[in-house]
A protein has these predicted regions:
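Active-site-proximal or metal-binding-adjacent scaffold patches in catalytic folds
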Residues: 1-66, 75-121
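Walker B catalytic acidic pair
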Residues: 71
Length: 121
């Protein structure tokens, strides 16, 4: 029951943020799916469908914004080229801060040492 509430919360958050950022970027998208992915925070299909990991609702809002912008940027560039990151940076100039947070959290969660910075969790 709790997981279902998390997924509903995630659907609401990602639906609102995708609509907002899609207008800023000047792109459209298909459907939004909320998933429990083990290795991804989000993805964008070649048809423009967006998938987001519901666990992101526990991340700082800036990180959620980054994932949404990252996936929507794929509607302009279906790769991780310089042009892709230029799209991301045009909306979120400090996106590298959010990328680092995500990388650090993943290392923390899956590390054998379990040495995590208190600011991450």
């Amino acid at each position: 029951a709790q997981r279902k509430r998390y997924i509903e919360t995630a659907r609401s958050i990602f639906t609102q943020k995708a609509a907002y950022y899609a207008r800023l970027i000047g792109v459209t998208y298909g459907r939004i799916s909320i998933r429990e992915q083990k290795t991804r925070w989000g993805s964008c299909s070649s048809k423009g469908n967006l998938n987001f990991n519901w666990r992101l609702i526990f991340a700082p809002e800036e990180v959620v914004d980054y994932i949404v912008v990252h996936e929507l940027a794929h509607r302009k560039e279906m790769n991780h080229s310089r042009a892709f990151y230029d799209v991301v940076a045009s909306i979120l100039p400090d996106y590298k801060v959010q990328e680092k947070w995500l990388k650090d959290v993943v290392l923390c969660l899956f590390s054998d040492t379990r040495e995590c910075s208190p600011s991450l969790v």
